[in-house]
């Protein structure tokens, strides 16, 4: 969902901030972006936007940001269908190529994301290729985690397979705690430096903050 920014920092990072401006821009995108779908909702400030995945929608968001549009974005969801009276979700065929020392962590993560391992082939030179069938919702946010688990040495590719009945239960959620701003103001270099040992920061010195804003991810769960 794309929506009007209602945070305490609304209106500070863009010149196009109203629902009408967002709607006009999204409908203009439909003229050239054939894989995009935009639907109005009961709330005039919120729009349902569907595309071909995180990368597709991420490119649209970045283009709009550079053009001066400011908005809030909801958590991505997969598009489900009802087939013969059964609720179904999209599944993908996933192939990962990793070093053997990272194999365990990757397999654990994909297991928590409802992945079903179909094949595993070592290459005899310290790497292994593993194939999975996994719900598309299990791949949301996995790219960054995969890069961390493999220290940037892993390869992954996935392609749509089919719509099949929804697997029960949710996929793995974020397992780490977060760092939260306790007051309004600007981020200070000294304060961020003192907090670095506690986790990875999302903000830089000089950025405006508000009370309750998530500013980093904690190193512990």
Predicted regions and their residues:
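Accessory interaction regions appended to the cores of large information-processing enzymes
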Residues: 1-221
């Amino acid at each position: 969902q794309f929506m009007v920014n209602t945070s305490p920092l609304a209106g500070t990072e863009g010149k196009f901030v109203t629902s009408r401006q967002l709607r006009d821009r999204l409908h203009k995108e439909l003229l050239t972006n054939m894989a995009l779908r935009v639907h109005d909702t009961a709330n005039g400030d919120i729009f349902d936007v569907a595309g071909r995945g995180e990368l597709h929608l991420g490119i649209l968001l970045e283009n709009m940001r550079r053009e001066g549009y400011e908005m809030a974005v909801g958590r991505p969801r997969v598009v489900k269908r009802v087939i013969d009276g059964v609720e179904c979700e999209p599944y993908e065929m996933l192939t990962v190529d990793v070093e053997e020392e990272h194999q365990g962590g990757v397999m654990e993560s994909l297991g928590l994301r409802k992945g079903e391992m179909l094949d595993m082939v070592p290459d005899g030179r310290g790497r292994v290729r593993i194939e999975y069938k996994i719900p598309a919702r299990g791949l949301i946010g996995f790219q960054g985690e995969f890069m961390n688990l493999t220290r940037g040495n892993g390869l992954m590719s996935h392609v749509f397979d089919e719509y099949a009945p929804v697997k029960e239960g949710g996929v793995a959620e974020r397992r780490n705690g977060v760092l939260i701003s306790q007051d309004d103001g600007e981020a200070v270099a000294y304060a961020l430096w003192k907090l670095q040992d506690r986790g990875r920061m999302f903000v830089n010195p000089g950025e405006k903050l508000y009370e309750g804003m998530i500013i980093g991810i904690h190193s512990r769960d």
